[in-house]
């Protein structure tokens, strides 16, 4: 009877989560995952993917600089990641004389490889479950703050006492909303040098227009090399360091991929929220995303109107516009995908079955109020969540005058709380920050953005959380007053204030109209919004942990219950597949270089194509990298479940060979962070044959290909 109840309870959960998708812990693949991967065509064993006793795939897939993924592709530490992951390093080495962003860069020897300050890659050494140690003593604690303090203390003890080598690091991460804790032993290499990068017209082809979009034709890759000391251990940069000898590196397949082929993606996905209740998903779909999209829509339209008329403004605002557009586009795709897949309704169906099964299993005392409590708390937090997101977009992100004011108010607080020494210590760094900000600032553009966004902000902010200055106001008069009279609108104005004594600084801050406006916004945010938001969010987090506990308690080993992404090493797998996002629209899983020429716009910053690449295409001079049909493969799709952080992840075939490089998702499937739908969710990879073609045939850097192990 007990077995029946457990299965009955999980019928509802399994219906929602029991489908392809998932981001799996590589040390825990035995059982359901192993069987499923074999069914999909995998020839490897799980020990080939993760092992502490022998070399395995994990030893060739390091975390790239804390935000991307990467893969080792030679026995000399040659490292492959995305162009957009290495963009900052490529940019840092670029000058007017040597513009590597525009023209590309290819080191002809080890001596020409370029060091990068603060760049690091981190390898996974060992993964251990430490849940019992971390949760020890917490069972009887009901106060969430006290429980969190003890957990932090226990984690610190685990990190301190877990065995490791002197050059390695220990860290502990929470899984399943705090129902499981895992120790990661890692080693970090800090001498990582730039080896090669295609020009942006290849590495960023399509830029903002093609971002999140299929069909895709972006050669999104760059090459680095890991260096180590003479003992092959991590070391700070030194000219005496030597190329790292990896425990494992990926052989590269030239065989290509076809529809239905097995694909495994190994990397470090950042954040997902797959187990949110329907109330939370509805709030994202109907409240949070529309607010964020609404503000950014205004920002982008204003900036674009100026960028189209003025080349100087276009240059200043190009990177800023791209940053704003990135998640604006993602949130729109996410919202559309949630609606199209009926995510809220599916969650509600699952919750109804969940509630019925709890009653049958006589679990009302433990779990009977979960869903009603979720509904109550999400309704209660909604105005504060809306306010917090509006404030984030309005005060801190999209308007320089307001974000500059916020920074100076933080400096003022440091002066009040920590004294003049702290004030003086922070001024220099803040001044450097302002120099960077004003380098790409235009006062009139910022004013116009403010004047239009403030109207949307005031109209959508809950009235009890709206500052008095924005009740019955004239947007044009307000903008004129702030931008004509505040020192926040120019670098010289900000510099003059930062050069004042502490006493003079405080007085000047009191009398500036811009500072006073930002102060009013921040005081409302800090005293009325966040205290309530944090209190309710703490309750929701505790409830989510209990909800996750119930899901785990009633799941079977064969159920597809994977932990949300949290920046740790994960395996996701699927198959090469196209998709149909709308009526009468069906996409193939592959693109070729032909598509680059179809999109080519001479001189365009997004769709220009280098002459040499056009020549190679015209001659069909693809070398050994073209396919049997005489085409040059470029990108392909699969059903692998990825998110931010998977950029640069290796795409691996059934035998453990590298076949591609993950770099994006399709727009229609970006809701996979919240709800994975196998019909719509696809990850986008650049075909490894195109990577090799660009390195060898386009750049003439065949010496790098010679380092690699090619499988024909």
UniProtKB/Swiss-Prot annotation:
Record key words, sorted: Aminopeptidase, Hydrolase, Protease, Serine protease, Signal
GO biological process: peptide catabolic process; proteolysis
Enzyme active site: 84 (charge relay system), 220 (charge relay system), 647 (charge relay system)
Its EC number(s): 3.4.14.-
Enzyme class: hydrolase
GO MF, one annotated term: dipeptidyl-peptidase activity
Kinase found in the keyword field: no
Annotated signal peptide: 1-18
Site annotation Is essential for the Asp/Glu P1 specificity of DPP11: residues: 665
InterPro entries according to UniProt: Pep_S46, Peptidase_S1_PA, Peptidase_S1_PA_chymotrypsin
Family assignment from sequence similarity: Belongs to the peptidase S46 family.
UniProt function note: Catalyzes the removal of dipeptides from the N-terminus of oligopeptides. Shows a strict specificity for acidic residues (Asp or Glu) in the P1 position, and has probably a hydrophobic residue preference at the P2 position. Preferentially cleaves the synthetic substrate Leu-Asp-methylcoumaryl-7-amide (Leu-Asp-MCA) as compared to Leu-Glu-MCA.
Protein name per its UniProtKB record: Asp/Glu-specific dipeptidyl-peptidase
Species, as recorded: Capnocytophaga gingivalis
Gene behind the chain: dpp11
């Amino acid at each position: 009877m007990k077995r029946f109840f457990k299965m009955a309870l999980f019928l509802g959960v399994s219906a929602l989560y029991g489908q392809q998708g998932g981001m799996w812990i590589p040390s825990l693949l035995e059982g359901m995952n192993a069987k499923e991967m074999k069914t999909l065509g995998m020839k490897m064993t799980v020990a080939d993917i993760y092992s502490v006793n022998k070399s395995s795939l994990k030893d060739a897939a390091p975390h790239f600089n804390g935000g991307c993924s990467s893969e080792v592709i030679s026995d000399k530490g040659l490292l492959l990641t995305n162009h957009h992951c290495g963009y900052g390093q490529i940019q840092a080495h670029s000058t007017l004389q040597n513009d590597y962003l525009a023209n590309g860069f290819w080191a002809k020897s080890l001596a020409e490889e370029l060091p990068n300050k603060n760049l690091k890659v981190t390898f996974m050494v060992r993964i251990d479950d430490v849940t019992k140690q971390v949760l020890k003593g917490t069972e009887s604690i009901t106060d969430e703050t006290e429980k969190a303090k003890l957990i932090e203390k226990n984690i610190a003890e685990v990190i301190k006492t877990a065995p490791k080598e002197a050059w390695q690091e220990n860290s502990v991460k929470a899984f399943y909303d705090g129902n499981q804790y895992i120790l990661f032993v890692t080693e970090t290499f800090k001498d990582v040098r730039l080896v090669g990068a295609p020009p942006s017209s290849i590495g960023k082809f399509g830029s903002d227009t093609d971002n999140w979009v299929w069909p895709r034709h972006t050669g999104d890759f760059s090459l680095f090399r890991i260096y180590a000391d003479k003992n092959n251990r991590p070391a700070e940069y030194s000219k005496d360091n030597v190329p790292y000898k990896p425990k494992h590196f990926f052989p590269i397949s030239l065989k290509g991929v076809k529809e239905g082929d097995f694909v495994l993606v190994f990397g470090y996905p950042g954040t997902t929220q797959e187990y949110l209740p329907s109330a939370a998903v509805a709030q994202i779909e109907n409240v949070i995303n529309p607010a964020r999209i609404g503000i950014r829509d205004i920002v982008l339209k204003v900036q674009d109107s100026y960028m189209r008329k003025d080349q100087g403004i276009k240059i200043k605002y190009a990177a800023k516009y791209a940053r704003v557009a990135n998640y604006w586009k993602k949130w729109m795709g996410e919202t559309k995908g949630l609606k199209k897949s009926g995510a809220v309704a599916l969650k509600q169906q699952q919750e109804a079955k969940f509630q019925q099964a709890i009653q049958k299993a006589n679990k009302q005392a433990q779990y009977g109020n979960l869903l009603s409590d979720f509904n109550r708390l999400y309704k209660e937090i909604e105005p504060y969540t809306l306010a917090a997101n509006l404030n984030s977009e309005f005060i801190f992100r999209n308007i320089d005058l307001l974000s500059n004011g916020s920074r100076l108010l933080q400096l003022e607080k440091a002066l009040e709380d920590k004294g003049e020494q702290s004030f003086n210590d922070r001024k220099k760094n803040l001044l450097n920050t302002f120099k960077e900000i004003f380098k790409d600032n235009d006062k009139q553009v910022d004013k116009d953005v403010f004047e239009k966004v403030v109207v949307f902000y005031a109209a959508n902010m809950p009235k009890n959380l709206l500052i008095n200055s924005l009740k019955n106001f004239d947007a044009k008069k307000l903008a004129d007053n702030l931008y004509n009279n505040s020192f926040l609108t120019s670098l010289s104005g900000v510099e003059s204030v930062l050069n004042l004594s502490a006493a003079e600084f405080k007085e000047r801050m009191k009398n500036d109209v811009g500072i006073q406006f930002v102060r009013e916004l921040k005081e409302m945010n800090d005293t009325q919004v966040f205290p309530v938001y944090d209190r309710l969010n703490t309750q929701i987090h505790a409830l989510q942990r209990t909800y996750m506990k119930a899901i785990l308690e009633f799941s079977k080993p064969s159920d597809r219950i994977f932990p949300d992404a949290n920046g740790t090493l994960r395996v996701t797998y699927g198959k090469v597949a196209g998709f149909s996002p709308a009526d009468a629209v069906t996409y193939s899983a592959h693109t070729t270089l032909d598509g680059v020429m179809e999109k080519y716009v001479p001189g365009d910053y997004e769709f220009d194509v280098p002459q040499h690449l056009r020549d190679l295409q015209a001659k069909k001079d693809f070398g050994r990298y073209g396919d049997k049909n005489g085409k040059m493969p470029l990108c392909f799709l699969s059903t692998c479940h990825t998110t931010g952080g998977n950029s640069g992840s290796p795409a691996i075939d059934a035998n453990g060979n590298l076949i591609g490089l993950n770099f994006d998702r399709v727009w229609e499937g970006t809701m996979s962070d919240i709800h994975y739908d196998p019909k719509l969710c696809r990850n986008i990879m650049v075909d490894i044959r195109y990577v090799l073609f660009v390195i060898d045939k386009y750049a003439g850097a065949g010496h790098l290909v010679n380092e690699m192990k090619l499988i024909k």
